[in-house]
Curated annotation (Swiss-Prot):
Protein's membrane topology: Peripheral membrane protein
Recorded GO CC terms: cytosol; endosome membrane
Subcellular location: Endosome membrane; Endomembrane system
Described function: May be required for cytoplasm to vacuole transport (Cvt) and pexophagy.
Record text about domains: The PX domain binds phosphatidylinositol 3-phosphate which is necessary for peripheral membrane localization to the perivacuolar punctate structures.
Species annotation: Debaryomyces hansenii (strain ATCC 36239 / CBS 767 / BCRC 21394 / JCM 1990 / NBRC 0083 / IGC 2968) (Yeast)
Keyword rRNA processing (UniProt): no
Record region (Disordered): 1-29, 42-96, 207-233, 536-555
The name this protein goes by in its record: Sorting nexin-41
GO BP annotation list: autophagy; protein transport; retrograde transport, endosome to Golgi
Binding site residues for a 1,2-diacyl-sn-glycero-3-phospho-(1D-myo-inositol-3-phosphate): 164, 166, 190, 254
Biased composition (Polar residues): 539-555
Length: 670
């Protein structure tokens, strides 16, 4: 489908038999070529200056100078720089403009070699450090992440580069524009506590219950840990909103998720073969310049680009209508407000309808799709949202942290009782008389019980740390995919809307052309009648012809004025059209020009219709294929996450049982 569509649509785009060429930097001149030209030109200038100063030099010296220049050119061509010239003879004879244009890129960088489809590589972020490189104020620093591209077959073969968080953001934004149908992996959000106040208003009951158990904690305040009730919000999942995490833990969290992002991109063939992605991993590439260059080659909107590959967009896509209306609200805070409204409605219905909320929540999840999908696709479409794993995880983590605080308080209380009892007169007198009654050992029993809660606090703190990194973190990453799927679905809906707008546009243009052709036919008939009558009646016929022409023009105006009551019609356009009709000195010529322009426009729009049919078919097939494979993979990931969660709970429970059994034996010995 993709090859056939591309051959029809992008006729100006070259086709490749072996593999797809995604290089966004064609016909660029290399750095070594510029250096070679600069050196040779400098050498020739020095030689000319020497000839002027020394007129008595013989041809032998001139030949030596030429040989030296030739050797310098050979050294440049045989260097290990990234770009080399294919035409060495031209370098030896001196570069000119034609030679400069004939330079081609014929190298394979280490990054490109490691990113071959059959290579076994992985990426990891080894460290994150502060840097002030490029900052005007050197006292201000930013975090830089060190990326390692490692060959698993040869661990010594590795490439290391350093990128900022904003570089990861720009990479993902460009990938979304190039491949709007591919599920681009998420990256960790930069701002962790976005709209926490609004989330507190919606989730006040949960946050209130968690605050009561965490106000006395030394480092485990979880009021924001339970403020978000929707797993689809990518910036508010449980792990990153835990306020007890310090900056270092958050940086480590971001390192892990950014490593997952890069490795997930490696698993996508379209991204892995993209030269732009290789530039991101190349330490010699200036990423700011690369972003500027690639952005200039992409359309301004993804709705005017080739859905298969934005870098192969044909110029005819610019004639498509814009499916995004001017009245649409595109604000960053609108989506969280809508999601919080849904949750508030759900809670209200639960109170009013005695927990019967399925009917009210079903319309929100059952999003109507313009394309008929398979039943399995619709069933698994919102698997992450319907499971509510992130909501349950927030509550469980809040309970665990509250339980840890309770263990701390209980351990302190029992230890205090033990100290109080040990200083009581009854215990002191029993010790003095060597009395072994049970009352004399009560302080020891309280001390052992206090040790139970102290050790239980240690085990549950270990459990919380493991769940944060091994359960909450991958679960939060999985939650972010729901927003990505919604973005792709919105793209599909708007492309279908774009197709309908295109059909309406073609219909209106054809109707307008038909009216103009009728007017032109009537005008030609009147002109023929005028030429057929005697000259004596010319004045009368002229007046009648003028009236008839005015009637034709008035009919055209009435045809154009049929849209005046439409709400989307711009009043300024009507006024402009009215003024144009008044000052037009040659309406016949204007009408002919409009007919020619409309015929060309209709021809272009009909070509766009053919493109849209192919694009809609391709989009439907790709979404069905990508979503099906994604959900299969995602269900496997969630299954592994739950298995890991189960293992942590079992291990924690066993440790608690061992603690109680051990203390029980010690108490029995007393």
């Amino acid at each position: 489908m993709s090859k056939g569509k591309e051959s029809k649509v992008g006729s100006s785009t070259p086709s490749f038999d072996d593999e797809e060429d995604n290089n966004p930097f064609p016909h660029m001149q290399g750095l070594a070529s510029l250096m070679s030209e600069h050196r040779i030109s400098n050498g020739s200038n020095i030689q000319d200056k020497g000839d002027k100063d020394n007129n008595n030099n013989n041809n032998y010296n001139n030949n030596n100078n030429n040989n030296n220049n030739n050797n310098n050119g050979d050294d440049d061509d045989d260097s290990i720089l990234l770009y080399n010239s294919n035409n060495q003879n031209d370098s030896k004879s001196g570069l000119n403009k034609d030679t400069f244009k004939s330079i081609q890129i014929n190298y394979e960088s280490r990054v490109t070699r490691l990113l071959r489809p059959n290579s076994n590589v992985r990426m990891q972020i080894t460290k994150a450090g502060n840097s002030n490189e490029g900052m005007i104020n050197t006292s201000k620093t930013y975090i830089v992440y060190s990326i390692q591209l490692i060959n698993n077959d040869d661990p010594s073969d590795e490439i290391q580069t350093r990128r900022r968080y904003s570089d990861f953001e720009s990479l993902r934004d460009v990938l979304k524009k190039i491949f709007p149908l591919i599920i681009i992996p998420p990256i960790p959000p930069k701002n962790y506590f976005k709209f926490s106040m609004l989330n507190d208003l919606v989730s006040g009951n949960i946050s209130q219950s968690s605050n009561t158990s965490s106000n006395n904690s030394t480092g485990a305040n979880t009021s924001t840990n339970t403020t978000n009730g929707l797993g689809s919000n990518s910036t508010n999942y449980s792990y990153i909103n835990s306020t007890h995490l310090n900056k270092n833990k958050l940086i480590e969290h971001r390192k892990r998720l950014l490593s997952n992002f890069l490795n997930n991109c490696l698993a996508i063939p379209q991204i892995r073969n993209l030269e732009f992605f290789a530039k991101f991993l190349d330490p010699n590439a200036n990423w700011t310049d690369e972003i500027t260059l690639i952005s200039s080659q992409l359309p301004k909107s993804i709705y005017f680009s080739n859905p298969e590959n934005g870098l192969k967009t044909d110029s005819i896509y610019a004639n498509l209508p814009n499916p995004v209306g001017n009245h649409s609200i595109n604000m960053s805070f609108w989506k969280p407000l809508q999601e919080n409204k849904k949750k508030l409605t759900k809670k209200t219905n639960k109170i009013l309808n005695n927990g019967n909320t399925e009917a009210s929540s079903q319309p929100s999840t059952g999003t109507t799709s313009p394309v008929n999908h398979s039943p399995d696709f619709i069933k698994n479409k919102y698997i992450i949202d319907n499971s509510c794993l992130d909501d349950i995880n927030k509550k469980i983590m809040a309970n665990f942290i509250g339980l840890a605080n309770d263990y701390t308080e209980l351990g302190t209380i029992f230890n205090s009782f033990s100290l109080i009892l040990s200083d009581s007169p009854m215990i002191r007198s029993a010790k003095a008389k060597n009395n072994h009654e049970e009352d004399s050992k009560l302080n020891l029993i309280f001390d052992k019980i206090g040790q139970i809660f102290d050790r239980s606090y240690i085990t549950i703190s270990t459990l919380i740390a493991d769940l944060e990194t091994k359960f909450s973190e991958p679960l939060g990453e999985a939650v972010q995919y729901s927003t990505i799927l919604q973005f792709i679905e919105k793209f599909e809906r708007r492309k279908v809307r774009q197709k309908r707008l295109l059909e309406d546009d073609v219909k209106d243009k054809k109707q307008e052309l038909e009216e103009l052709l009728k007017a032109e036919e009537g005008s030609s008939k009147i002109e023929n009648v005028m030429h057929a009558q005697p000259i004596s009646k010319h004045s009368g016929l002229n007046s009648r012809g003028t009236n008839s022409t005015q009637n034709v023009n008035s009919s055209i105006k009435s045809t154009n004025s049929k849209y005046k009551y439409l709400p989307n019609m711009n009043s300024f356009k009507k006024i402009t059209q009215y003024v144009t009709d008044i000052i037009d000195q040659n309406p016949e010529q204007t009408r002919k020009q409009k007919i020619t322009s409309l015929q060309e426009k209709i021809g272009t729009l009909e070509k766009c219709q053919g493109i849209m049919l192919q694009d809609i078919s391709y989009i439907t097939d790709e979404i069905n294929k990508n979503f099906k494979s994604f959900h299969t993979k995602q269900l496997k990931i969630i299954y592994e996450i739950l298995l890991c969660y189960n293992g942590f709970l079992v291990e924690w429970a066993k440790k608690n049982v061992d603690i109680w059994e051990e203390i029980k034996d010690e108490v029995e010995k007393l």
